[in-house]
Amino acid sequence: MKTKIQALVLSVSEYKEKDGLVKVLTNDSILTLYVRGLFKQNSKNLRLVQPFSYNEFMIEDKTKMPLLLQGQTIHYYYHIQEDLFKSSCCFVLHDLISKTKKEENLFNILLDCWNSADKKLDDFYFWACIVLKYCIEQEGIQPFVDGCVHCQNTRVETLSLKDGGFLCEKCNHNQYPKWNVDQLKKYRALFKCKEENLEYVKVHFDFNMDDLIYLSKWMEYHSHKNYPSIRFLESIRGLE
């Protein structure tokens, strides 16, 4: 059965001899497409399946994985590839999305993120953190932000990755550095907000690469996986 889909290309890799696997995000799923002869010199599909491509694909459903037959590019966000920091951030997002159960909001949010990175807009890190918020929530590993994760005291002073939520002064025992009030409010707002409240969070709080890295490491730690893309992003953090 042949099906037409719209998809965002997350990654492409070689498979067997000259064939390829393309990981894509659609409106309702995360798919791995099989592409015959993708890495042959005369391949017409290689340019089509570059990361940061928003495409329309014709696929054929197969037993193991869908086969990509043909397609066309709706928009290629090529400027992202020219920015080491933004592209590295996006590759972290793509890796985490690829390991996540589908969240219905991810498609449009990732498009907003790509658009912001491509046009060098100020809200890129906000959208990146929203992508991570949805990934974390879909995995059921979101931090406890209604009070101290151990005693529910609402007078909290830090967010602990290992403990899984806010800590009050007593439960922290000076283990972790205190966060300023604005930072605590920001993370509570991030994980309490619904889709209709995103604009409020965007206007009232500033997000940066440190937030992106922290949320990425949160998902990495609590999902018990290792992502080299996060290590690379950390290694170039000081160059920004």
Language-model segments: residues:
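Non-catalytic alpha-helical scaffolds and adjoining flexible linkers that form interface surfaces
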Residues: 1-20, 25-240
